């Protein structure tokens, strides 16, 4: 698990998204810390007014400078039929370029609804991340 600090409340926040019948994919985001802006292992996301992800990227230059960016927490929930649909999708260029599976879904027009947590969760994506966690 690369998200060892997830708690029950974080899972519940994603589950709560599904009270809206239009939600087919849910995920968790948190405020982006300044120290993470240039870290390519931290996936950034911007959202619209309905908390639907507009774009995911490892790099800040992919976003409009005026838009607020969030840190993506790598956990998803899906409706069963959506999961079967996602399995059938073709890989996209942006997914391959950034190594982010969620770009395939965005490229194929699936909405990813985001729940915001104020918790700054530490993900383990690199050896540096692991060392940081082991020092805690």
At which residue positions do the language-model features occur?
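The conserved acidic donor/metal-binding loop of glycosyltransferases
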Residues: 1-4
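Conserved core of the sugar-phosphate nucleotidyltransferase
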Residues: 6-93
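Conserved alpha/beta core of the MobA/IspD/sugar-nucleotide pyrophosphorylase nucleotidyltransferase superfamily
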Residues: 67-136
